[in-house]
Amino acid sequence: SRLQQNLVMSHACGTGERVPSEIVRLILLLKIQSLSYGHSGVQLATVERLIDFFNNDVLPVVYQQGSLGASGDLAPLAHMSLPLLGLGEVEYKGAVRPAAGVLSELGWQPIELQSKEGLALLNGTQFMSAYGVWALIQSRRLSEWADRIGALSLDAFDGRIEPFCDEVHLIRAHKGQLTTARNICRLLEGSELIARPKKHVQDPYSFRCIPQVHGASKDTIDYVEGVLTTEINSTTDNPTVFPEEDMVVSAGNFHGQPIALAMDFLAIALAELGSISERRTYKLISGARELPAFLVAKPGLNSGFMIPQYTAASIVSQSKGLCMPASVDSIPSSQGQEDHVSMGSNAATKLYRVVCNTERVLALSLIHI
């Protein structure tokens, strides 16, 4: 209907940088998943066209700014939906092109939206959820690398292995803590450096407390996985349709608070992996434990690894700023009807930056070992 088409066009008011292609693919996938449950009131042809987009890598151009994270991700999902109507732009075969031309090239007719379909496409948390899923996958990888780099740093710093023994962690049985301690022991098994007698009694916290800090981040990742698994297997549309009960309910499943909180939490957990890693880097270049200052033979003549630590510190500081929770803010909109919003989209895009930052900090730590 004309109303549904107008809804899509009027809500396509996003701005800022483009959403990365891998995130757009996830948005499409998650929207297809949500609509497939049959509580959204859409025609089969609309869902099939979204599947066509996904399978043929026809990726709508979507922008990062514009969603309040309640009433769903209205602006980003409007941009996702425009190409269904032959409007907007898509990325296809590596180039951004008008959607109408790509649809014509592929022999696809624009979809004529029926009653409720515009709302079904615009309402939903798929923008936030796509960022969350991407970040979760990256978090697992970065958590594993943080343990490996932490173990190598401990070895290089002539650290003690005793704080990583099972006995210590079984009396404070956080799952992530125990897992991390065992990872470190396994990674350093057979090392002559870690096994040799030590002069010092204790290591700095950034080494000694690897299980407690890395472990807490692991437990956070597990929690966020549970939240996102529930979210992406849900209907987050409004109003929701129950055909068997002959019932349509206007409710609030579009509100992004569950994942907004989770993504803020995950950003903090990942930033801490970067923060503690940078501190170990600093210790390695400090001239302690018979290591040369800045890890260079002639520190007066050469700067060695002095400036890479500056870079890591700068990135860590930026991540700390990005960890200000987005979900604590709410600005009323729609003449006060939408008087509490999650700001989950801001949590999502900040989380993306924290993930990238943490990867860079870990890479910088690795080159110091």
Regions found by a protein language model. Give the residues of each.
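Short beta-alpha connecting loops at secondary-structure transitions
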Residues: A130, D166-L170, C209, S250-A251, ...
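Active-site-surrounding "flap" and adjacent substrate/cofactor-binding loops of secreted or lumenal enzymes
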Residues: R2-H11
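Conserved small/polar residues in nucleotide/adenosyl-binding loops
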Residues: I367-I369
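Glycine-rich anion/phosphate-binding loop at the beta-strand->alpha-helix junction
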Residues: A70-H79, V224, L228-S327, S333-S334
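Active-site cavity-forming subdomains of large catalytic enzyme subunits
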Residues: A12-P20, V24-I171
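Accessory "access/gating" subregions that flank catalytic or transport cores
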Residues: L154-S275
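Conserved structured core elements
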Residues: L44, S71-L74, T125, L136, ...
